[in-house]
């Protein structure tokens, strides 16, 4: 019987990345996937010979540069054409957020655009404090090591360097719900709906659930094309990126 050093259950993009990292480290890895084709949300489906549609994932907004390097992804898949976010309404023209999560906004008043940029800059700055923990192994509950304490200490120092007022604001917002944050900073229901959607996509929380803002922090810890909060469509669509993961 063939033996393996590691068995990864699930051939989605996370499972495939884990398998690739283990394999590069010299481990013999088996990936188990229930579907006949690996890729998970990145998996595309052919609906006619010569034509392929994307699966659940339509855009890329959290492709870690280290993962792209690990998988040796070509430039046309690791980056691509920046795509805007369009928020539709049946009463007014659409709000269009361009560049990295609304650096430029069309379809809203100047005052509202300024309010959104203030919120955007605040959230990106705060998400940067949490970002340092994403690639760390969670500490064991019974034996927190020196490196874990050092990571917490560096996060605390980064928070202190932002000043007392910003530090208090971060600690206040950290456990809040995204709906209250939207009401606090914004007046346009389209933009409120956008941040609520991004904060709760893929999680079992509603916009008024406590801690739902954490989902938006997570969204803004990622980057695309070198820009925090950006999003793009790779050449050939997301399905082409999924094939590269395999």
Locations of regions flagged by a protein language model:
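Active-site/ligand-binding neighborhood in enzyme catalytic cores
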Residues: 124-246
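N-terminal glycine-rich phosphate/pyrophosphate-binding loop and immediately adjacent elements
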Residues: 2-144
């Amino acid at each position: 019987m063939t033996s393996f050093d590691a068995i990864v259950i699930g051939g989605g993009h996370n499972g495939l990345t884990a398998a690739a990292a283990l394999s590069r480290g010299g481990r013999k890895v088996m990936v188990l996937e229930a579907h006949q084709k690996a890729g998970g949300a990145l998996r595309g489906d052919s609906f006619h010979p010569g034509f392929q549609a994307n699966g659940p994932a339509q855009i890329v907004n959290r492709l870690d540069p280290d993962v792209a390097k690990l998988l040796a992804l070509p430039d046309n898949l690791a980056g691509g054409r920046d795509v805007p976010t369009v928020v539709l309404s049946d009463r007014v023209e659409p709000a269009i957020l361009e560049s990295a999560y609304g650096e430029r906004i069309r379809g809203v008043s100047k005052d509202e655009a300024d309010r959104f940029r203030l919120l955007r800059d605040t959230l990106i700055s705060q998400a940067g404090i949490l970002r340092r923990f994403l690639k760390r192994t969670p500490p064991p509950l019974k034996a927190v090591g020196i490196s874990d304490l050092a990571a917490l200490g560096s996060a605390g120092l980064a928070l202190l360097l932002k000043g007392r007022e910003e530090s208090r604001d971060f600690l206040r917002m950290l456990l809040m719900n995204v709906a209250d944050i939207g009401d606090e900073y914004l007046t346009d229901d389209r933009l409120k709906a956008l941040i609520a959607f991004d904060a709760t996509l893929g999680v079992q929380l509603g916009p008024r659930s406590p801690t739902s803002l954490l989902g938006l922090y997570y969204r803004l810890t990622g980057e695309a094309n070198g820009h925090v909060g950006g999003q793009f469509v790779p050449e050939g669509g997301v399905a082409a990126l999924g094939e590269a993961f395999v």
